[in-house]
């Protein structure tokens, strides 16, 4: 049995490029969502994500099967950058915010250029990662609610604006310490972040909501008590019903045309 070293090398380069880009998405995803273990690099995570994305892009260009194949990327990237600059102006942010927006826009350029089929694969990876993490954290959160002592450390973020008891698999905001059943926020700094991101991930998983990781995401969304998450979920459900209704209408119309032919 002969092994084609050239083909194997080209295949490896494509795989490495894909792994680098998945890593860049991981950094950008968890960094932008303010998870507690990304707090030490919160100020410069866009640079790390951009460097990983750049390495992936350059390596992909040397492969005979590149992973950055989409041609429609310039307009959405410019729109994203302009929106970011506008938000910075409205909030009167400093130069660091504008630099961060530039790196985020460059990262979005890579995302818009990335192969759409592979992009669905990445969304599934993120859904499985977060869904798996939530499944592990649910029993510990239940133990906390019933009063079982769990190891934790104090955590302060953003000059004291956020103050938590960090149980590693989930956070409890200090303002919620005496609440009978606090809002579940997992590893995120606010329950709203958990509600929003689980809803958006569920949107990418339309048609696969019965999978274990999507059920886990749905539970996390529900117990986050996030109004934003509930609004997103409602919009997604109505969108799904509209699409399914459209499919049924097209199928019925096709049958009518076939029978009348």
Q: Residue ranges of each PLM-predicted region?
A:
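N-terminal signal-anchor transmembrane segment
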Residues: 1-63, 81-87
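Membrane-interfacial loop-to-transmembrane alpha-helix junctions, especially the N-terminal start
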Residues: 11-22, 62-77, 122-126, 212-213
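Structural signal for the C-terminal ends of transmembrane alpha-helices
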Residues: 53-65, 110-119, 204-209, 238-246
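Juxtamembrane non-transmembrane "cap" segments at the membrane-aqueous interface
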Residues: 147-168
């Amino acid at each position: 049995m002969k092994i084609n070293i050239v083909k194997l090398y080209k295949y490896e380069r494509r795989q490495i490029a894909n792994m680098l880009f998945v890593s860049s998405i991981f950094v950008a995803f968890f960094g932008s969502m303010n998870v507690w273990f990304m707090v030490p690099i919160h100020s410069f995570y866009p640079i790390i994500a951009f460097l990983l994305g750049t390495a992936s892009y350059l390596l992909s260009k040397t492969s005979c099967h590149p992973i950055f194949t989409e041609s429609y990327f310039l307009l959405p990237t410019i729109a994203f950058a302009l929106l970011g600059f506008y938000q910075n102006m409205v909030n009167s942010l400093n130069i660091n915010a504008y630099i961060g927006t530039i790196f985020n826009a460059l990262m979005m350029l890579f995302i818009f250029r990335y192969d759409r089929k592979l992009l669905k694969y990445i969304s599934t990876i993120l859904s499985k990662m977060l869904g798996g993490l939530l499944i592990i954290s649910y029993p510990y959160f239940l133990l906390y609610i019933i009063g079982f002592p769990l190891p934790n450390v104090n955590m302060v973020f953003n000059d004291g604006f956020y103050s938590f008891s960090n149980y590693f698999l989930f956070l409890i905001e200090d303002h919620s310490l005496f609440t009978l059943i606090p809002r579940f926020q997992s590893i995120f700094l606010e329950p709203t972040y958990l509600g929003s991101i689980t809803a958006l991930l569920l949107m990418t998983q339309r048609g696969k909501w019965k999978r274990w990781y999507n059920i886990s995401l749905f539970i996390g969304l529900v117990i986050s008590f996030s109004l934003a998450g509930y609004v997103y979920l409602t919009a997604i459900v109505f969108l799904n019903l509209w699409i399914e209704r459209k499919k049924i209408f097209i199928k019925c119309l096709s049958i009518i045309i076939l029978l009348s032919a």
